[in-house]
């Protein structure tokens, strides 16, 4: 049996607010990271404020499965990923991922983390659909999500403004049966 929380490049671990909050504060000082990740205007928060927010979030969000992303090679904390179950009866969830350490951008770590969380979503939580949204200008993320099996399901035109221009938000999703078919093909390659 495979370790549910380990991929080819990363492993998911529990959230440690004390550790992750200082990394979050540093990552969120990177305006490019912030603008690729979030609808909100870029702003700065202290590690203390982030830690307090994380602790409240972890306590109150019983339908959220939130993990740190660590490299297998040296156990380096490089990002986080969360899966928010939006409807248990229909098996729906929303996923978000952020690789905060720039040295790991564009090298497959985010895609690997997404593959791990999808395995968890479909094999452990028995979900039917996982969805996400992404800004159209985040082409690297769109390619990563497509590699993980997500398909474009819709767009909200001119939803976000960045640098004086309006951009679309793309909505992508993957169904359990689509993932299972691809997972079976990957499993037989081993």
Where are these regions (language model features)?
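Conserved GNAT acetyl-CoA-binding A-motif
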Residues: 123-133
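Active-site acidic-Proline motif in GNAT/NAT acetyltransferases
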Residues: 101-103, 107, 123, 136-137
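Acetyl-CoA-dependent GNAT
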Residues: 43-103, 175-178, 187-189
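Short glycine/proline-centered loop/turn elements that form peptide/ligand docking sites
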Residues: 110, 114, 137-141, 158-163
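Conserved catalytic-core motifs of GNAT/GCN5-like acyltransferases
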Residues: 131-134, 151-168
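A short, well-structured alpha-helix characteristic of acyl/acetyltransferase catalytic modules
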Residues: 1-51, 178-190
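Conserved acetyl-CoA-binding loop-helix of GNAT-fold acetyltransferases
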Residues: 106-120, 142-147
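Conserved active-site tyrosine of GNAT-family acetyltransferases
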Residues: 145, 150, 172
């Amino acid at each position: 049996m495979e370790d549910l929380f380990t991929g080819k490049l990363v492993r998911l671990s529990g959230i440690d607010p004390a550790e992750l909050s200082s990394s979050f504060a540093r990552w969120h000082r990177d305006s490019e990271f912030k603008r690729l990740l979030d609808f909100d205007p870029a702003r700065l928060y202290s590690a203390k404020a982030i830690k307090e927010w994380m602790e409240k979030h972890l306590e109150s969000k019983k339908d959220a499965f939130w993990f740190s992303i660590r490299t297998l090679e040296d156990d380096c904390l490089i990002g986080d990923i969360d899966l928010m179950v939006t409807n248990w009866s229909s098996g729906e969830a929303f996923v978000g991922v952020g690789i905060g350490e720039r040295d790991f951008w564009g090298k497959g770590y985010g895609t690997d983390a997404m593959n791990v969380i999808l395995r968890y979503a479909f094999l452990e939580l028995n979900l039917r659909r996982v969805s996400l949204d992404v800004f159209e200008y985040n082409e690297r993320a769109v390619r990563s999500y497509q590699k993980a099996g997500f398909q474009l399901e819709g767009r909200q035109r001119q939803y976000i403004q960045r640098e004086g221009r309006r951009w679309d938000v793309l909505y992508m999703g993957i169904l359990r049966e689509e993932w299972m078919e691809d997972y079976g093909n990957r499993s037989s390659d081993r």
